[in-house]
Amino acid sequence: METEVNVAEISALDYEGRGVTKVGGKTVFIKGALPSERVGFRIVRQKKQFDEAEAVAIFKVSDERTVPQCRYFERCGGCSLQHISPAAQVAFKQRMMEEQLERIGKVKPKQILLPIYGHVWHYRDRARFSVSLDKLCRLKLGFQAKKTNDVVDISSCMLLPKPVSDKLSAIRGLLQDLAEEGSVARFAEFYRGSEITVLNIAFKSKLRQNEENRIRQWFDSELSDGWQVWLQIEGGVSQPFYPKTDKTLKYTLPEFGIEMPFRPGDFTQINTDTNRLMVSRVVKMLDIRRGERIADLFCGLGNFSLPMAKSGADVVGIEGAENLVRRARQNARLNGCDRQTDFIAANLFDCTEKTVASWERFDKMLIDPPRSGAYEVVKSLHTPYLPQKIVYVSCNPSTLARDAGVLVEKGYMLSQAGIMNMFAQTSHTESVAVFDLLPQTGKNFLKIKGKD
């Protein structure tokens, strides 16, 4: 690859947080460069449509540049924006959302919401660590390096709660000992709840008795009563291992008086504090009237369903996995809102107009899909089953933009949109959008409803 150093002005950031410039008419994405900066860079990868490069010198520094706090930042793939000030990170994500909506969806929000800010350090309540062994059987524990599958061995992480970060070296030591005895962990992960922190370790095969004893001894010397070790064997379901405890892995939504038990492997938001703010905003956006029938699509464990029910709605949560549906029902009973909720197992990626009709009409709808979005759902919505309001929570601005374009074509107005800084120091963007059914579309609905 080229060793020559080129110099250019940076015009923008791409969706990964890389600086963008053009050289000889060809776009170049430069890691470590910011808009308005003049940088020296070296090409590291050439492609037909664009080149990728790394900044090697900065001749004009942006006011938005800051010093990364983590010593692993240059190599670790866990973060990509530590060199950008927190306020500039939020502004970048806001611009990215607006640009995607306009470019992909051909839509523009009537109102841009103020961002939801969260903590910028030590905010992660769960994380999975990769594990690898080198030829000398030395174990690495950490996150994968940028653009590769190599594991960056870390002894601390600025995004983790300090009590977890402080234990990384001890966890590595345990996994090293087990590897030398013949049991190499596939991965290790932690989950922090309101009562307890769980260390979940996955192995390809069942541990021997001496290895289990080694974990118990290690726990007693390294961890405290606020922890518990779980094991996942042969790709099965994780199970509590040591010690026995009455404490439950759960998170809380205090505004709604909700406790949400969960298990390792369940999807939960990684940032509990920002999740609380997000749930509160979404419930306010829905403007719930008592007795309204509201759908919660991709409902998971009921993160939105239960607060909506507590706010007076009759909620139907729809989720693809039967086990999650069962757990959502349990959570509803636990929180005293099972009479206001119903949960259905359905593959929303196979959604059709017939599927939508089978649900009957909802007054309002919440959509909270994975990164791939909810295209099959939004394209299947049709009169007379169009809800008056849709709130769409997204972790991928490009699929939000695509689906927003479909909803506007179906007679909705994109009333509001904004971001929530759920993933500080990374380029991942959590956003929310509100779609209101236009009056003319509503009249069409009323006419058809009257004929029925």
UniProtKB/Swiss-Prot annotation:
Reaction equation(s) it catalyzes: uridine(1939) in 23S rRNA + S-adenosyl-L-methionine = 5-methyluridine(1939) in 23S rRNA + S-adenosyl-L-homocysteine + H(+)
Binding site for S-adenosyl-L-methionine: 269, 298, 303, 319, 347, 368
Single annotated GO MF: 4 iron, 4 sulfur cluster binding
Active-site residues from the entry: 395 (nucleophile)
Keyword Iron belongs to the record: yes
Residue numbers binding [4Fe-4S] cluster: 70, 76, 79, 157
Claim: rRNA-binding is one of the keywords in the record: no
Family statement: Belongs to the class I-like SAM-binding methyltransferase superfamily. RNA M5U methyltransferase family. RlmD subfamily.
Protein name: 23S rRNA (uracil(1939)-C(5))-methyltransferase RlmD
Encoding gene (name): rlmD
